Amino acid sequence: MILSSFLKIERMSSMHELKFRDLNVEVNEEDTVLLSMTESEIIVLTKKEIDYGAKYINHIVLYCNTDGRFLNSFSIQTNEQVINVQKVDDSFLFLIDKEYEDSVRDVEPNIYLWNPIEGFHQSFYAGRYINSMIIDQNKNLWVGYDETGIFSCVDQEISTRGINKFVLKNGKYELYFHGVSSYVIDQYFSTFVSEDAIYLYYRSMGEDYLQKLNLLGETLERVEVGIECSSCIKNGSSIYLFSRDDDSYNIEKVFKTNDMQNYVEQKISNENNGESLCFTQVASYKDKVAGIDHNNKLFLLNNQSL
């Protein structure tokens, strides 16, 4: 968590709490876990190496993101490691971990679509060194890149934009060739989806920004953010930033703001017993948040505590 010197952080004697419900789901701690969300679902993917890393078994479990009910589960084998998973309609999008040679153009597919009926049915190249991806309300795929991809020095490399949008046409994703952001992006962190907007979170010229777009992709505002956040939700006029601790790298605090300069610190707690929670990862979509704590238990935000 990095705080800019001009910010005002309010720490109240009786700190407001964001309460999370224990879904009584324990994720297998021996497996690597990926967590993501859609409009209606929590996606938990656990992956396990087999054949000394030559293959991977990816076990996906879906839960309802309003009440935590179990919805479905799938097991998919891949030859390469999955590092991000999203879902559109009945298809899952798997981002594959891939190394790239410096200054050498390589457009081999790194995103694969799979569904229970067709199996793997589409693949495409989405840029090198992808740092984040999410699907918005209109089924557009937003892909952001780390600085290695942005400054890759490869001719016609799409990663150099910092952020790209892929649109779904006739059941297939295609690159939206118009620029998403007119600002210089040095490092892209994440994309957040709210009820009526898209938020791009990135670093430009040494400062971190949230750029708000409407659903047509037009910029509405761009504000400097003084707190590093791993996830973000919007409720009414308030924005909640989930921040990682610099030392433990766990998510233990939330900062609420209406203007990106004045923040109220809030704790994360278990609604059943009031104990503080410490998340290793969180995922958000609109005003929904799910988290996995240090005991590998799955929690869902009680939105009445916002």
UniProtKB/Swiss-Prot annotation:
<protein>
    <recommendedName>
        <fullName>Immunity protein WapI</fullName>
    </recommendedName>
</protein>
<comment type="function">
    <text>Immunity protein component of a toxin-immunity protein module, which functions as a cellular contact-dependent growth inhibition (CDI) system. Neutralizes the tRNase activity of cognate toxin WapA upon expression in E.coli. Does not inhibit WapA from other strains of B.subtilis. The WapA C-terminus cannot be expressed on its own in E.coli, however it can be cloned in the presence of its cognate immunity protein gene. Cell contact is probably necessary for growth inhibition.</text>
</comment>
